[in-house]
Amino acid sequence: MDLRQFLMCLSLCTAFALSKPTEKKDRVHHEPQLSDKVHNDAQSFDYDHDAFLGAEEAKTFDQLTPEESKERLGKIVSKIDGDKDGFVTVDELKDWIKFAQKRWIYEDVERQWKGHDLNEDGLVSWEEYKNATYGYVLDDPDPDDGFNYKQMMVRDERRFKMADKDGDLIATKEEFTAFLHPEEYDYMKDIVVQETMEDIDKNADGFIDLEEYIGDMYSHDGNTDEPEWVKTEREQFVEFRDKNRDGKMDKEETKDWILPSDYDHAEAEARHLVYESDQNKDGKLTKEEIVDKYDLFVGSQATDFGEALVRHDEF
């Protein structure tokens, strides 16, 4: 077994070993918060910095001089302006904020890409992925660790085909990202729902009933009483999850559960940044307008917040 397979098995075994009967498994995919800072521009622009750059990148700007911050911000603006018309719209800014918040996903894809693009042609075929991930264990029809790797491979192949938009079984980096992180792509959400239902639907009737729903979250340990959160989840299932009150969740009800329509924090922040920076009030930003408000977008080591507030109030 190669290192990748060993680590995969180790992580799975560790997860099983460390899990406790009363721990709650959360299958709901929420949009992450843009920042753990309070969004109060009267006190600081830290929330805006985290939202625009991502929390880790925002820290690097705190070490720059104002001149360095402005220069680097100008380069970022050029990337945000997708259609290169010289303006940054709310939609372009929203897309950038979402990218900044999910930079870790792209970093994860980059790491995995190097291990799967075996012929280094800038693409990852299903054969490359299968050989790199399952090549060794498939030779052993009855592995000692008990995992059904063939079943896992069939499931991965189905997801790979869904991510592969042109159906050539060769993934571009964007398609490979959709394969590894399907919850981030609208066209992959059905496969996320399907896989979730397969995991929970123990009697394979195509639905998730109350006991299957609870059983996925909680393993009863002997004669102990159910934790309070389990009772709450039972109520949630009856009152909110099972919308048509037939005692089980179908595909659409499961989708509403695990992929809720959250408040779009990225769009709200994009509109806020445009409102605060749009000097001529034309609904879009020039590079000059953004750089002029660099303290709002990125800050710097030498930003005087009192002076920044004066400029903020002038607009």
From Swiss-Prot:
Domain spans labelled EF-hand: 68-103, 104-139, 151-186, 188-223, 229-264, 265-300
Residue span of motif Prevents secretion from ER: 312-315
Locations listed in the record: Endoplasmic reticulum membrane; Golgi apparatus; Secreted; Melanosome
Binding site for Ca(2+) 3: D164, D166, D168, E175
Keyword Secreted: yes
Database matches in CDD domains: EFh_CREC_Calumenin
Sequence positions that bind Ca(2+) 6: D278, N280, D282, K284, E289
Residues engaged in binding Ca(2+) 2: D117, N119, D121, E128
Keyword tags: Acetylation, Calcium, Endoplasmic reticulum, Glycoprotein, Golgi apparatus, Membrane, Metal-binding, Phosphoprotein, Repeat, Sarcoplasmic reticulum, Secreted, Signal
Glycosylation sites: N131
Entry's Gene Ontology molecular function annotations: calcium ion binding
Cell membrane as UniProt keyword: no
PROSITE patterns according to UniProt: EF_HAND_1, EF_HAND_2
SMART domains: EFh
List of residues binding Ca(2+) 5: D242, N244, D246, K248, E253
Residues carrying Phosphothreonine: T65, T254
Modified residues (Phosphotyrosine): Y47
N6-acetyllysine, modified sites: K165
Family that this chain belongs to: Belongs to the CREC family.
Subunit description: Interacts with GGCX.
Protein name per the record: Calumenin
Taxonomic lineage of the native organism: Eukaryota, Metazoa, Chordata, Craniata, Vertebrata
Gene (UniProt): CALU
